[in-house]
């Protein structure tokens, strides 16, 4: 029985080879599933390579591509949630680059907590330095 499954898997085709191209592009997934996945046949899975050639040229390594995706995700988040360069207003704080960031209440709370955490760590480091010098 295990031999049957192995032979079925090695002899199986990919769905993109079975389904005609025009039907794959134009037909709904539910209709395709009803039409092609009714039998007990096992199909191989394929993944399309979706990264544009320009990205491959600029970032040839996987690590570079992941760093790029991470940066653009953070940039999109910053733009969406109001961290954009604007004129100085009452509800904004200036960062080290001279632009302004509109900070929501959650951001203000996190900044306060991180400042308190940094001050506690600095006190521990000062104490460590004093004890080390003794």
Swiss-Prot record:
One of its GO terms (biological process) is viral DNA genome packaging. Keywords: Host nucleus, Viral genome packaging, Viral release from host cell. This is Tripartite terminase subunit 2. InterPro entries: Herpes_TT2. It comes from Gallid herpesvirus 2 (strain Chicken/Md5/ATCC VR-987). Component of the molecular motor that translocates viral genomic DNA in empty capsid during DNA packaging. Forms a tripartite terminase complex together with TRM1 and TRM3 in the host cytoplasm. Once the complex reaches the host nucleus, it interacts with the capsid portal vertex. This portal forms a ring in which genomic DNA is translocated into the capsid. Belongs to the herpesviridae TRM2 protein family. One of its GO terms (cellular component) is host cell nucleus. The gene is TRM2. It is found in: Host nucleus. It comes from the Viruses.
């Amino acid at each position: 029985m295990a031999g049957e499954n192995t032979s079925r898997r090695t002899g199986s085709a990919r769905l993109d080879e079975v389904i005609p191209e025009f039907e794959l592009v134009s037909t709904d997934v539910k209709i395709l599933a009803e039409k092609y996945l009714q039998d007990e046949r096992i199909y191989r899975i394929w993944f399309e390579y979706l990264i544009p050639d320009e990205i491959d040229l600029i970032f040839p390594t996987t690590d570079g591509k992941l760093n790029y995706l991470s940066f653009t995700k953070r940039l999109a988040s910053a733009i969406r949630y109001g961290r954009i360069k604007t004129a100085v207003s009452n509800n904004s704080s200036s960062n080290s680059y001279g632009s302004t960031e509109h900070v929501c209440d959650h951001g203000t709370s996190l900044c306060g907590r991180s400042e308190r955490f940094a001050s506690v760590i600095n006190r521990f480091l000062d104490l460590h330095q004093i004890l080390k010098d003794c």
